[in-house]
Amino acid sequence: MFIGEYNHAVDTKGRVSIPAKFREELGEHFILTKGLDNCLFIYSSDEWGILENKLKQLPMTNKDARAFVRFFFSGASECELDSQGRIRIPANLREHALLEKEAIIIGVGTRVEIWSNVEWEKYNSDDNLSYDEIANKMAELGI
C-alpha cells in the first residue's frame, strides 16, 4: 500500500525521483497517466491490469464512459526507473499536471499521485476542502 507525502525537484529534463518506499512496490515497470484534479497517477502493472479490466467492461455506447476511457488511456505512458530512481515525465503529462520545478509525490493506497507543489497547496486550502463535509460524505458511503 502506498502512503505518505514527499517533496522532490523536477529537473530540466522532466525527471523526478520516486520515493524509495514506493519503488519496490511499483516494480520495474509501471504506468504513469493523467489523473484527476490536475495530478498524475502511477499504477503498478498489477493495479493497472485490474483497472484496465474494469474500464474494458464499460459500455462503449455510453458517451461519458468513452470520454473517460480515452482520457485515461491516451495519457498513459509505460515507465521504468533509471539508475538513480527517477522517472522521466513526458511533456504532455507535465503540462496536464502543471509541473514545473517542484513535485509533491503522495501515496494513495493502490496508486501514487504526482502533483505540482502549487496545485497541491491549492487543493489542500481551506477554501477547497472541508474535512467535515468529506467526513459526512464518507459516512453516507458507509466508511
From Swiss-Prot:
The gene is mraZ. It comes from the Bacteria. GO terms for molecular function: DNA-binding transcription factor activity; transcription cis-regulatory region binding. SUPFAM superfamilies: AbrB/MazE/MraZ-like. GO terms for cellular component: cytoplasm; nucleoid. GO terms for biological process: negative regulation of DNA-templated transcription initiation. HAMAP family: MraZ. It is found in: Cytoplasm, Nucleoid. This is Transcriptional regulator MraZ. PANTHER family: TRANSCRIPTIONAL REGULATOR MRAZ. Residues 5-47, 76-119 form the SpoVT-AbrB domain. Belongs to the MraZ family. Keywords: Cytoplasm, DNA-binding, Repeat, Transcription, Transcription regulation. Forms oligomers. It comes from Alkaliphilus oremlandii (strain OhILAs).
